[in-house]
């Protein structure tokens, strides 16, 4: 798939990714409204890939293998789909869950499908001085190594949260469209190079 942007699979568009690094999408969270009331007990009993424990959580948890995803299905007809690696896969998975519900006899529709969160990650392949970064970008950074090993960077534009690790591994979360993930990474990349650790 040309649009996946997997490292090493095809030349990187340097216009869009001046750093030469394209974050890989790891998880897409989407929601959809099936627009009908659901009997969760019936679904749990009749669908073979479903679990339902109302004492623990008020939704049926359903899984499919392709695309490898998990859905939370609520009695209201609202559904959350997690685990897909691209927007198209997330929508395809959500449609498959909707079809399963239809086959069980519910008049499920497919309304208001929406990507709620995109999680991406990448590796800048050099170590980063997190203390220095946290000090000079104090307004956006929280870094408490005894609580969590990564620096949490809350970017304002686009509104993305980045987890930055000493190793040079970066996690980006909070995007609604993949370009926000890419823009956030390009914004932070010069900062990361500025706080590059010198290898002894």
Curated annotation (Swiss-Prot):
One Pfam family linked to the record: TBP
Alphabetical keyword list: DNA-binding, Nucleus, Repeat, Transcription
Entry's Gene Ontology cellular component terms: nucleus
Highest taxon in the source lineage: Eukaryota
Gene3D superfamilies reported for this sequence: TATA-Binding Protein (3.30.310.10)
PROSITE patterns cross-referenced by the UniProt entry: TFIID
One of the GO BP terms on file: DNA-templated transcription initiation
UniProt entry tagged with the keyword Zinc-finger: no
Predominant cellular place of this UniProt entry's protein: nucleus
Subcellular location: Nucleus
InterPro entries: TBP, TBP_CS, TBP_dom_sf, TBP_eukaryotic
Nucleus recorded as keyword: yes
SUPFAM superfamilies reported for this sequence: TATA-box binding protein-like (SSF55945)
Sequence repeats: 25-101, 115-192
GO MF terms held by the record: DNA binding; RNA polymerase II general transcription initiation factor activity
Subunit structure: Belongs to the TFIID complex together with the TBP-associated factors (TAFs). Binds DNA as monomer.
Family stated for the protein in its record: Belongs to the TBP family.
Function: General transcription factor that functions at the core of the DNA-binding multiprotein factor TFIID. Binding of TFIID to the TATA box is the initial transcriptional step of the pre-initiation complex (PIC), playing a role in the activation of eukaryotic genes transcribed by RNA polymerase II.
HAMAP family, A to Z: TATA_bind_prot_arch
Protein name: TATA-box-binding protein
Gene: TBP1
